[in-house]
Every structure is written in structure tokens, then in C-alpha cells.
Amino acid sequence: PLAQYDLKGSDYVTLCDYSAIPVTISGDYDVTDQDVLDYVEKIFTQGGPFYTADPDKTTVEEGDIVNVDYVGKLDGEAFSGGTAEDQNIDVSNNSSTSGSGYIDGFTDGLIGASVGDVIDSNVTFPDEYPNNPDLAGKEVVFTFTVNSIQKEVTMDTMDDEFASKQFGADSVDGVYKQVRQYLESSAESTHKNDVYSALEDYLLENCTVDMPADYRSDVIEAIRANFIDRYCSGDESQMETVLSSYGYTEESIEQEWSDSVESSIRLELIVKAIAEKEDIQIDDTEFEDYVSTIVSSGGFGDADTLYSNYGYGDYVYGKNQIRVIYLAGLVLDKLAETAEITENAVEETTESVESTESADSTEE
């Protein structure tokens, strides 16, 4: 079993000098006012359209977006899936503003209605209605409550009330503040990931590892068995066909597995060796919190499923691997404190420069 390979790093690793690792990273880690404006614009162009009540409109006309509550009834009884609240409906296109279409005639009764009206609309479901066969061909009554007639909101017309309702911000300025915080957090995370990736590359290149061959071959075999179980229904004879559908041969995938496993084991042993030398310990409570976060964000259901997944079916080995990942974070935290970090600004590509010059040449 893979669980036997809970190895001591210092038995296999000759460490390099990691007291002041030189790291060079390239990226745009600063957030400008323009970045914030661009992101808010992206929210409205890609996440919209957004709407709010138009106090100047009281009667529904063709082309309007109407906010309604509705209840659908068959023979006087509300039916499943026929009730909704706070729905924005495009009356001209007989659809929701998200683009979902309604059955023919659904919005016909709304034209001419006033805000505050409660109206009944008789609608017949199509003879074939796979979403709910019990309603196929049936005449039903939808009772609409007209809450408001809507108007579109853009980033320029957004007000504090809309900012609160749509984005949970206390004001329009609060929306921009939220976006800046998000972008700065993302930039900080990217910066950290770039530094840690460079630190890992340095350690792999400069530390010497005596590769435990049995460990390496057993992990590769476990990956292979797991692949056959998950993607070939346990039938090894299907492996060639399945791999070809992904553009692989058995030789190419096994080479990829081999390279990946070797790099992973080397980094695992280096991390352990540094942790042993620096007496970096895992706090069990903090580790449990870390595991809970992974389980929740990764949709694993519970820790046992997480461990089994990372251990290729071996629960104990999987838990050990998660501990190694967590330990690696602690080790890299320490190395980053003393690393000599050089940040290179991202250079404009030749194409973008030429594009700008071309655009400038057309201006008068």
C-alpha cells in the first residue's frame, strides 16, 4: 500500500542553500483606478442587463420589462413549478430577461395592465410538454401581480438603492470599493502564487534527491489503476481506446505520469527535509480547518472522500499527501520571508504597440 511511503525527507535529500533564494517574477500586481472601472463595466456588460423599478411608468406597453409575481393553477389548485416571485418579464418576447422562453400566450394579459393590478390570464399548455407531462394540453390560469415596470440600469445610472439591492454595498462608491478589494486580493494571490512557484522551481533545480524507486513506481501503478477504474469501467482492455479519445497513447500518458510523479515526489521530500531542519510543525487544529475548507470548496462531501481521492483509493496515503501539501505552504511561507524577489513589469507585446501606433495614425 502507498501508506507505507511516509518517508523522512532528510534520508533522501541534500539541501541547497535556501537562506536567500533569488526569485524573479513577471506580472502586473498593481490595481489602478482604470482597472476598477474596467471591471465594473465588465460586470454590467457580461452580467447584465440589470433592471430597477421605473417610477415614471405605470401602464404596461409593448417592449416593456415588467416585474411580477405569479401563481399558476390547474382546476383551482396551484401546480408544481407554476409559482414565482420578483420575476422580470420581457412582454414583447414572451420570455424572462435571462432569455428563458414561456409557453405561448403567457404574457399576453400583461399588456395594458397597471402597476399594482392583479390579473388572471388563461393559458393552454402545448400538447407535448416534457417538462411536466401532467400539464400537456391542459388549460390553466396564471394570476399575475404587477409589481413594477422596469428600466435598465447601467454603471453610469446606478444609484445607492440599486447598489445595495444588487451588490449588497452601502452605496455606489461601496460597489467600486468592493471591486477594488477583490482585484487587490486577486493580485496579491497571483503575486504569492508566482513567488511560491518560483521557489519550488529553485528547490527542484538546486536540491539533490535520491529518488526512492519503489515509491515512484508504486504511485505510477496506483495512478494507472485509478485511471482504468474511473475512465475504463475497470476494463484494462478499453484503455487504448479511451486514451486515444484524449489524444494519448499508453506510452505518452505513462511518460507524462512518470514525469509528474517524479517531480511531485522530489518536491515532497525536499519540503519534508526543510521542515525537519527548521522544525516546522503542523498544528492539527489549523490543519483540520484547512481540510474543511478544501472539502467545502472542492465539493468532496467529507474528509474521507478527499483523502481517498488524493490517495488513489488509499485513505491513509491520501491524508498524508494533504498534510504534505499543507506543510509545503508552511515551508514556502518561511522561504518567502527571506527570498530576494525581483519583480519585472509586464512588457507590452509588439502587436499591441503596433496596434496603438496604427490607431494613432488614423486620427486627425
What is each model feature region?
Residues 1-364:
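FKBP-type peptidyl-prolyl cis-trans isomerases
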